Amino acid sequence: MTNILSPEKSENDQELPIRPSYLQEFVGQQQIKENLLVFIKAAKSRNEHLDHTLFYGPPGLGKTTLAKIVSNEIGVNFKSTSGPAILKAADLAAILTNLEKNDVLFIDEIHRLNTSVEEVLYPAMEDFELDIIIGEGPAARSVKINLPHFTLIGATTRLGLLSNPLRDRFGIPMRLNFYNNDELKKVLNRASKLLDIDLTESGSEEIAKRSRGTPRIALRLLRRIRDFAVVDSKSVVDKEIADFGLNRLEVDHIGLDSNDYRYLKFIAANYNGGPVGIETIAAALSEQRDALEETIEPYLIQIGLLQRTPRGRVITIAAFEHLKMPVPNKSHNQFNIFNDNE
């Protein structure tokens, strides 16, 4: 699923010029920043590596940026890879043996590591040792390699998919939450200065409230609205040009787009608001289940338009009102069955 409001990183997202390098430049996630600063200062004062750290939460909130910031704050090398890129234990061994003391190794999508790779990672995280099997069959032997102390930073949007042994080895687990409008405005104002965009307060407010609580989306929308401003010979991005551009991009006043409307209308029109299973929804919309669960559903749940229940997905009365559709003749409890994940 690819669209302007996807929180997933796109090849067109040019974030490096505006990505903050230190904690004082990073906007939002205040408690995480304060705690990280304490942990980093303590580790530096002891001349030790920072404990292994896990950043988890919805995509687009700054997990990769924070990982890079940690290495900058400590003053060490930053090595980056991803779960899908580490196909076998030898790939991980090659990365680990090239680390230096206190370096930061960042593994994005760490929940996608396969079991054989995880088994190599456990002793590396706990004992800073690497067990390598040399040879095959009866002649095979195990060789132990000592590793420098390093910090592993993992990032995941699917905490529940991490195995318990791996999750338990992270001494610093941190959940990143959606941003509020004021925080998004600060992100936009900082980016506008770095990108030389004349962004007004009203323009910043308009973009922020339609950005689904996600900085990556806010920055993407800012760039696209700048394009509309340039073509229309506007020198300033104000509320008027922001509203015009966002409407052209089919982003409504609360940050929903055509994919969200398809999702909500399917449940409303075909299942009287639900409950309906996620596999049924995915098949009907020709989308992958993971795409729905990671891209569409988190924000709909966040703003109170959707509930995940043991019996399936249920859209709320507020969703019917937003769709301007009549509310089915159900009791109020049927719209609030349970608040557990399916």
From Swiss-Prot:
It is found in: Cytoplasm. It comes from Rickettsia canadensis (strain McKiel). Homohexamer. Forms an RuvA(8)-RuvB(12)-Holliday junction (HJ) complex. HJ DNA is sandwiched between 2 RuvA tetramers; dsDNA enters through RuvA and exits via RuvB. An RuvB hexamer assembles on each DNA strand where it exits the tetramer. Each RuvB hexamer is contacted by two RuvA subunits (via domain III) on 2 adjacent RuvB subunits; this complex drives branch migration. In the full resolvosome a probable DNA-RuvA(4)-RuvB(12)-RuvC(2) complex forms which resolves the HJ. It holds the Pfam family RuvB_N. Mg(2+) binds at T64. Disulfide bonds: none annotated. The gene is ruvB. This is Holliday junction branch migration complex subunit RuvB. Residues 253-342 are annotated as: Head domain (RuvB-H). Keywords: ATP-binding, Cytoplasm, DNA damage, DNA recombination, DNA repair, DNA-binding, Hydrolase, Nucleotide-binding. One of its GO terms (biological process) is DNA recombination. SMART domains: AAA.
